[in-house]
Amino acid sequence: MSIKYLIVLGIRPDIINYHPLVKELKKRKCDFIIVHTGQHYSYFFDGLFFKQLDFPHPDYHLKVGSGTQAQQLGKLVQKFEIVLRKEKPDLVFSFSDANTSLSGIVASKMGIKVAHLEAGMRSFDWRMPEEKNRRLMDSISDYLFTPTLSTEQNLLNEGIPPHRIFRVGKLIYDVLDHFKKEIDQNKILEKLQIERKDYFLVTAHRPENVEVRTPLKNILETLGVLYKKYGKKVIFPIHPRTRKSIKKFRLKIPSGIITMNPIGFLEFSKLEKNAFCCVTDSGTVQEDSCIFKVPCVTMRISTERSETVEVGSNIVAGLNKNHILEAVDRMVNKKPNWKNPYGKPQSAKKTIKILESRSNEILSPKVWWNHPKIEKNLSISEYQKSWKNKLLPDKTFN
């Protein structure tokens, strides 16, 4: 009897990072289904990526959409439970830290095994919604697949049992390695009439950066200074949220900045790989630039990709204009000779191999127990003894 896997995704990075996992599952002829929560959905943010990555069309689309945290999570929990009861998977994959990842909580409560990919990442900034999601998912997952030694250590420090932790590297490294030829052959540089290492690549989309006037104004002004100081164009694919805020706050885009709508995975990866420097608030760009050996400056006050700072590929500069400019100057004047902290591009292969080796554990009958009936005049010690006798051993949590 083989394991039935369920992959749940909801945002663009999920589609990209799940690619090697789906490829490995197909190669092994495993049984799997794909559920798209619809946390984010548009042609540019999903459809184009499905096409470029040759990603299977989801079996279910929950159409959760945007809204408040409570609205989004409420719809996710209700709709995802229906799919789980119908499909009865043996294991659910949950990726990283978006709200979609919390679908794993529903699976766990139903007695279904959960594997958390990109586990152990920590910004240690409790103000970030993603930090809460990461910690919640790591605490309830049965199998935690970490990308680096430091993420593994984070879990051990939090008391996660070692037998649930597996260091396998980064899925994005698998993706970039697989599509290396397609990325190199992409013609986005010619289309934009720019040369290799003669432009900055910028992304800004986080709500705290673009939904408040002052930080967004600072970012735009900083980009204008970069163009004047270095004489290099600034390529800025604008997230819909950012474009909406620029219009709302009536901000001007400085000269030298080339703006565009969101672009495909291959186009963006080609721009990343050949940039003079990446200036971003994106977690994925921090990883990509580290792998591509392109200097990166992060416009945030914290990062869960601490390994990029440790190896020297990235500086977390905050949102102060002078601090960002100083960080850029430091990064572009150093040799990109840092070590890749992500091992080899074999993360998906290792992940599935580990899970398949534990098929007996994953496929074992689900154990349920009923709370002991409370009798009148039962002492606390007698009640505790009765409760303990009702528990059946579960080797997974020993």
Annotate each language-model stretch with its function.
Residues M1-K232, F236-I238, T242-N398:
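Nucleotide-activated sugar donor-binding and catalytic core shared by glycosyltransferases
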